[in-house]
Regions:
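Conserved catalytic alpha/beta cores of large enzymes that bind or transform nucleotide phosphates
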Residues: 52-149, 154-157, 196-201, 221, ...
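Short coil/turn segments at secondary-structure boundaries
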Residues: 4-13, 146-153, 410-414, 476, ...
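Conserved alpha/beta-domain cores
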Residues: 32, 137, 307-644
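Extended, highly charged
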Residues: 1-46, 57, 109-143, 147
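Conserved phosphate/anionic-ligand binding catalytic regions in large, soluble enzymes, centered on
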Residues: 28-74, 148-173, 253-258, 328-349, ...
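Structured core elements
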Residues: 22-26, 38-41, 52-55, 149, ...
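Beta-strand scaffold of nucleotide-dependent catalytic cores
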Residues: 35-44, 48-104, 161-167, 175-178, ...
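Acidic, glycine-rich flexible loop/linker segments
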Residues: 157, 169-173, 193-196, 201-224, ...
Length: 644
């Protein structure tokens, strides 16, 4: 007759005195000498069903389930795992400050221990163990024919993995996917706490700090629950909270699981919420901005966009997305799409890697101790600093490719300008000061330069890992800002030299269908410089497709500085000169058997420009996710008007 049991029976209309108990007895896996955790056979935040999500920490599993530690997190992609690939698409190290172990003597059977710093900075599972657990999870899911929530343990004495519990996942599995619901912040303010976002909603209200069960009766409906961790007995008050914020825990902790079931936003593992948020303070809790949940001071404005997809009819022109943030990719995968026409890797480099590649390559030679210390902090657990860059790059790109699989994902190799590269840790040691970086050392000219070729080779190696190790053959690559055919040849030769040799054949390219990945690699080029179009026949001999970069093409055709507001009024992609170039490119590329796409908001913002492109027979249009639905409807109307 605990609060939780009484509440459950009330919800289910069970008689309090007409229930029975059962007791299961099973061998205890000695994970106190190993590790343990939980597995979900889908992405718990988005409901993406092609993922196995594994959480793991040292010691007995109770700390992971209760959210008392921030565990390691691993993501495995099911479709290519089933084909025999090592499809680990993400590895994130948790802080793992403490663990639960058996107690020797005393009243309590278990006790809490601190984790050795060396163990905190290494993963709790190796790749073989991650893949074994993922395969078991897929077998269990296929047996029960539904997404599953699984607990597992690694016995440190026997050196064996065990599955100790499996039950149906009860939140995302119930969603129909017919109505898209998106919460959007309309204001920003002072951020007072950050942690892992649970769900994608926004909640707000007065904060109430609950230290222990004795204070539960103080909690009022609509308040924001702020606490160290939650306990199963707290579920009656969690139901009436507008949001939940905890100091400890990960995405599979008790607070996270119950929040998802209740449809309440939660930010877990903040570390400092109970100190940063005062009782009675009005706060807004946002889980709608990616994997990082934010607690803002004050009641900020937000909105909820709902779209019914029941009768949605896609256009014949491929509508693709512009994607950058791997943490949002699985949410965006539910939008109607035909893949990604521009995957921007700059976001991965600046937000996940944060270090200039040459600073990692030259780590042993660095004399700037400040830079070296920053690198040490970010690369904790990596003896090989170059491997850190390669792994982070591959995991970021791998998640983008997996989210939109089996449709094509076109990755643009890094297109930072020198001033942007200088902003990375160690970047000022390697980057020149240019008067106009927009027109300077960027794109293809970097890749074959002796001072950057090693750095570029890491990008190539990461793409090779994504395609050949993870099995994500839907990933293709694109070379930006390639001024001449000679530059194009140099870059393709470097790509081949560093391991990406399995190029698609012209015959395979001709027969290739979007949504049916094949092993051959496509290498596209951005058509963003007039020379790309004026020499289209020569570029077509080197590359497998063209992607129009309308911003740079407009800038370079009209001689505009696109960062200058003073001359922005002069023209955009609808200018006759720009359209004339596009009108040359599309039929010329088609005559050579190559496809042409465009990246940018023009077709969405200007219906007449969209009609112009469809009339020319453009193969794909890539847009920001928030305009995909609107643009799809507009392009379908244009196709109907033109009788396509």
């Amino acid at each position: 007759f605990t609060n939780r049991a009484i509440s459950y029976r009330q919800d289910k209309n069970y008689d309090h005195f007409n229930v029975a108990l059962s007791v299961a007895v099973q061998k205890m896996a000695r994970s106190d000498r190993g590790s343990s955790g939980v597995i979900f056979t889908l992405d718990t935040e988005s409901g993406f069903k092609d993922l196995v999500l594994i959480n793991s920490s040292w010691g007995l599993g109770e700390f992971v389930v209760k959210g008392m530690v921030t565990p390691d997190e691993f993501k495995v992609f099911k479709p290519t795992l089933k084909k025999g690939f090592k499809s680990i698409i993400s590895k994130r190290m948790g802080s793992k400050e403490k663990k639960l172990v058996y107690a020797h003597g005393g009243v309590e059977p278990t006790t809490e221990q601190g984790v050795d710093p060396v163990d905190r900075h290494r993963f709790t599972l190796d790749d073989g163990q991650i893949l074994k657990l993922a395969k078991w999870a897929v077998i269990i899911e296929e047996h029960y024919q539904r997404p599953m929530d699984i607990e597992w343990a690694y016995d440190g004495f026997m050196q064996e993995l065990f599955v100790v519990q499996a039950r149906p996942e009860t939140v995302q599995a119930r969603k129909t996917g017919k109505v898209l619901e998106e919460f959007v912040m309309e204001q920003t303010g002072k951020i007072i706490a950050k942690g892992a976002a649970v769900g994608a909603k926004i909640g707000q209200g007065k904060a109430r700090y609950i230290k222990d069960a004795s204070q539960l009766s103080d909690f009022q409906k609509g308040e924001v629950l702020v606490t160290e961790i939650t306990d199963p007995d707290w579920e009656p008050i969690m139901k009436i909270a507008s949001a939940i914020v905890t100091n400890a825990g990960g995405r599979t902790s008790h607070a996270a699981i119950v929040s998802r079931e209740l449809g309440i936003p939660a930010v877990v593992g903040t570390g400092n919420a109970t100190e940063a948020i005062s009782g009675g303070m009005e706060v807004t809790v946002s889980c709608a901005e990616g994997e990082v949940g934010k607690v803002y001071e004050g009641l900020l404005k937000f909105r909820v966009d709902r779209t019914d997809l029941t009768n949605f009819q896609p256009p014949k022109t491929d509508i693709k997305m512009i994607a950058a943030d791997p943490e949002l990719a699985f949410n965006y995968s539910f939008l109607p799409h035909r893949g990604v026409g521009l995957a921007r890797v700059e976001f991965v480099i600046s937000n996940f890697i944060k270090i200039h590649p040459n600073a990692l390559i030259d780590y042993e030679k660095l004399t700037d101790m400040g830079v070296k210390q920053q690198i040490d902090e970010l690369t904790a657990g990596y003896k090989d600093k170059v491997q850190y860059y390669l792994d982070k790059f591959a995991y970021g790109v791998g998640q983008l490719a997996a989210a939109f699989y089996p449709y094509d994902v076109l990755l643009r190799f890094s297109d930072f300008k020198s001033n942007e590269y200088a902003g990375l840790i160690g970047g000022k040691l390697y980057e020149p000061i240019e008067e106009n970086p927009m027109m300077g050392w960027r794109g293809a000219s970097r890749y074959y330069d002796p001072s950057f070729e090693k750095a570029f080779s890491l990008e190539v190696a990461a793409v090779k890992k994504v395609r050949e190790e993870m099995g994500l053959w839907n990933l293709s690559v694109m070379v930006p800002f390639c001024r001449t055919p000679e530059e194009g040849k140099k870059v393709v030769e470097i790509i081949n030299r560093h391991g990406l040799t399995n190029r698609i054949t012209p015959e395979a390219r001709k027969n290739k269908k979007n949504g049916e990945p094949i092993e051959g690699l496509e290498i596209w080029v951005m058509a963003e410089i007039p020379s790309n179009i004026l020499q289209v026949d020569e570029f077509a001999e080197i590359f497998d497709g063209f992607s129009i970069g309308s911003n740079d093409l407009t800038q370079l055709t009209l001689g505009l500085d696109r960062d200058s507001k003073l001359i922005a009024h002069i023209g955009n992609e609808r200018n006759k000169a720009v359209q004339k170039l596009i009108g040359i490119l599309i039929p010329a590329a088609h005559a050579k058997g190559l496809k042409v796409g465009i990246c940018g908001q023009g077709p969405s913002d200007f219906p007449d420009f969209g009609e112009f492109l469809v009339g020319l027979g453009i193969d794909s249009i890539s847009l920001n996710p928030d305009t995909v639905l609107k643009a799809s409807i507009n392009i379908k109307a244009v196709e109907d008007k033109l009788g396509r």
